[in-house]
Amino acid sequence: MELPVPSLKDVKWSSASFPLDLLVSSYRLPQLVRVDCAGENVEGLRENDCLLIHSCRQWTTITAHSLEEGHYVIGPKIEIPVHYGGQFKLLEQDRDIKEPVQYFNSVEEVAKAFPERVYVMEEITFNVKVASGECNEDTEVYNITLCTGDELTLMGQAEILYAKTSKEKSRLNTIFKKIGKLNSISKLGKGKMPCLICMNHRTNESISLPFQCKGRFSTRSPLEIQMQEGEHTIRNIVEKTRLPVNVTVPSPPPRNSYDLHFIREGHRYKFVNIQTKTVVVCFALHTNKIVPMHFPLHLSVPKFSLPENLIKGEVWQDSVVQHWYNICQEQFDIEEYSRAVRDVKADWSEECKSPKKNWSAGHSHIPNSLSYARDELTQSFHRLSVCVYGNNLHGNSEVNLHGCRDLCGDWAAFPQDSPQYQDSCDSGSDYLFSETSEELTSLPAKPELPYEELWLEQGSVKRSGQPLTRSQSEKNKCDSFRGSLPSRCGTSSLPSPGALLTTKSLDVSLPPPPVPPKSEAVKEECRLLNAPPVPPRSSKPSSPTPSVPPAAENIVRQQTRSPSPTLSYYSSGLHSIGITESETTSSSDNSQVSCYPCNWMKNESSDLESNLTCGSASSEALPSRLSWPNRYCGGAEGLNVNDLPMDQCRSYYSYPRQKTPGTPKKNSPATFDFGGCGSFTGCNQGEFSDTVPGCPKSASYSLESATDRMLGDNSTKQSLSCPALPPRAPKPSEGNALSEPLSLPMKIDGAEEEIQTCSPDFLEEHYLAKKGVQDIFSISYPFSSPLHMQLAPRSCGDGSPWQPPTDLSGLSVEEVSKSLRFIGLSEDVVSFFVSEKIDGNLLVQLTEEILSEDFKLSKLQVKKLLQFINGWRPKM
């Protein structure tokens, strides 16, 4: 006998009220809630109204304005979903009037006009033999390949040395051949070739195009030119043209019963920009009717209260939710509701910002030195939708934010997320969109496939061995089982604040965005640069970059430094801050799955919570360094000494340079206290917790360096010339021996943090380890310098003395640092050389004037360094 469904009047509600983002991230949907505080701006809602929270969805819409003749914008802004089924025809664009389309037949013509950007209209291949130098006979063939549609942002001009072909000197060869001196005077002919330096956005690489290169270029994309004819969907227009763009409605559009703005035949619109936002779709359960509505995820009002039975975990709550869910499913089509055309609500303008954009790694880690290129990217909205948004271009994707946050305001992984709560339907309803993916996704080749599958195929991540994404058709198969979710996933009571300390996971592994690597031709051009490139036109940060939420403002720091006046833009290293492609791949493999509004990773085991037993961790303990290519970022995970891959090193180029804004050119390193009783709290010998309550946000370099330094004597295989990878997450069995948290007292920018005492056993052990290191290397270096500079003087790390080679031109940046320490130069000099990325090739070209005026070296230091470059070596 079935029990009758309880009435909403019989539900007892809790006294506490919470905003939507807390509810959605804490409980699986659907759920019943009651309005506690409706606020003034929420139409159709009153206090004590009951709502069914249906689902959390990501909507991608195009903001548009109505147009009058003459391209005047009128009326309110509207939002057109990317899946809108109507067709549009492109009009004459405003930019076509202001900047008529130009066509060029060679690079030289492009350089004379020097527009902001050009597009390649046909495939171009060009070969040039580049000479290594005036006195060097080495040459290298530089192959240029440009594909149709490549977008090139112009950056400047320069000259490179090239090897003349035999035809150019054939007459001279004939003369010398007659007099028998061809072999003695047959040196390679060289000439200077002017080049146009561009950024190719397809390859994300800077290239040098010789003026001699022939080919068709245009200031309009060939795709955009093709789009001028015919009718196109809004998605097609956004992907292939550069917004803003003017369109007209050539034929009667389809109708949607949920449309709040009616698009009619003959209307004109200006597509302004793209917006991706996360909304919560709800149903207001009035006594006489049910009204669908939606809210942006981060509205402060309305606030809602939960049923007490949900907190207690009573089973009958399942039947109430299922009853109203079935009614809403029968009466309303959520997919159609999500694709409706609406007016933009002015009161939600600030609140509707996409959580994905606010927390996107690609947007929050753009160095100022590359902002000119990113500025061009963000102004081109078709690339914004395809490349920068990545898998964000969803017209109607359901998102599951459950398990990210508790109702006390702290992020946590709930017991409901353990494997025992996962079943075939349950896992299928998880829509987690990785925040760490920076891959450039290509245009879909098979439009007949479901749109969500196309965009998530490359970046799909698996959790618990099951796919996290699926098509809409697959999602519908599980709708009939949705009623079992509340009882299965909403039965556990909220964790207490004390228990939250054991469940925190603050790991954020966000690799920096890909930056253009230095091509071989540019390397050659930089060595003998006759005319330095014109500096970028836009040195300001890109304006369209979304604002960073308050929680991330202290974490994200844009770092840059002005290049030395005598070094070119490329030699100064501003172009080479990012990570290589292979490291990007490895980092994306290791990066945890995350969803907004939290960043959390899968639990290795459901009992990981019991591993961490102490700490005063807070949300303020988020590290400032978000660019480790693996999982360790200083979160509340166990750190095992044995897990450190001591025999593996990362190159210096794997990590961006860490410089805080406003620091002088010469580093003034902060001190790191390894002595005294204030260094570490009581820990076991093998492992310790890395929860750092007293560590400032800017101390991540020092914290990670301290780990490497303390463990340096455990493995002689670890080369001190490059940092060891940070520790990986512990296995469940390794976390049982954790004791009190580690506290690292540091001085960062003059700010002194609290010092905790430590156990005598650990102190004695640590002192002996420290003393052994000091006996071997005799000099301690401050840890505020970058990791690759923490090198022992005159040592390779395996005990053998560092011996610089006779030819210094082939040294890497790390080896140049070793060489400078080898001849006894101070640490601030070494750090300045590293910050300028001086390798051996640049080192041997430094003159006395550059060293004294630009590098600010003393006369003695200049003399010693020049003698060292010329072959002098100190006696060991």
Swiss-Prot record:
- Say if the entry is tagged with keyword Phosphoprotein: yes
Q: Which positions bear Phosphotyrosine?
A: Y451
SUPFAM superfamilies from the UniProt entry:
SAM/Pointed domain
Region (Disordered) residue ranges read 460-569, 708-741
Which residue ranges are recorded for the region named CABIT? 9-318
Give residue ranges for domain SAM.
811-876
Q: Where is the composition biased (Pro residues)?
A: 532-549
Q: Provide this UniProt record's keywords sorted from A to Z.
A: Mitogen, Phosphoprotein
Concerning Pfam families, the annotation shows: CABIT
Q: Spell out the molecular function terms from Gene Ontology.
A: proline-rich region binding
Q: Which GO terms describe its biological process?
A: cellular response to epidermal growth factor stimulus; epidermal growth factor receptor signaling pathway; positive regulation of cell division; positive regulation of cell population proliferation; positive regulation of ERK1 and ERK2 cascade
Bias category Polar residues: which stretches? 461-471, 556-569
The UniProt similarity line reads:
Belongs to the GAREM family.
Give the protein's biological function: Adapter protein that may provide a link between cell surface epidermal growth factor receptor and the MAPK/ERK signaling pathway. May promote cell proliferation.
Q: Which PANTHER family match?
A: GRB2-ASSOCIATED AND REGULATOR OF MAPK PROTEIN 1, GRB2-ASSOCIATED AND REGULATOR OF MAPK PROTEIN FAMILY MEMBER
Protein's recorded name: GRB2-associated and regulator of MAPK protein
Organism this protein belongs to: Xenopus laevis
List the gene name: garem1
